[in-house]
Amino acid sequence: MNSTTSPYRVIAVCTGNICRSPMAELMLSAAFAEAGLADAVIVDSAGTTAYEAGRPIDPRAARKLTAHNLFSDRHIAREWQSEWFTERHLILALDVDHYGWLRASAPDEESLSRIRMLRSFDPDLEDGDPLEQGIEDPWYGGHADFDAVWDQVQAAVPGIVRYVQDAIAQDARVADRNGAGTVAAPAR
């Protein structure tokens, strides 16, 4: 990427934006930084509902993240905004209901092409049915449920990083050919 290229935007989406999606956001942000892409990729998160909007991350999620030196003290839950369909390059649904909601809400085919189940990047599930790729809401459970979310997201992180690296490289080649300086939606 060159200095005139816009960052690649990734968003993780769950229900209330206080457990799964902020965990994924921080885990992915750390992975992109470790891959040398901190300035090239912006990761954020949102919920499909406004139930938790304005609230901090669930303390159990925060504890799990802190145990891995990821700090969520600045996170404030927010609801999905429809303009993000065009402003995000990769939209990661954390569970099947989020995937269905996002697909039903998408305004066009290009937006639909940006929506993926987060766990579709897990090599053990990548060829599976999206209905089998969900991450259950840990909110109703205990610490073991937050451990499971961590493990499930972590299994997909390397695949997401590779996917974004490939998309950035492809977009840089297109931009170089066209003399442009923006990141396009990833080719499918």
At which residue positions do the language-model features occur?
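Helix N-cap/beta->alpha junction signal
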Residues: S21, D95-V96
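Conserved active-site segments centered on acidic
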Residues: N2-E87, Q165-A172, N178-A184, R188
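Phosphate-binding/catalytic loops
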Residues: L90, V96-R188
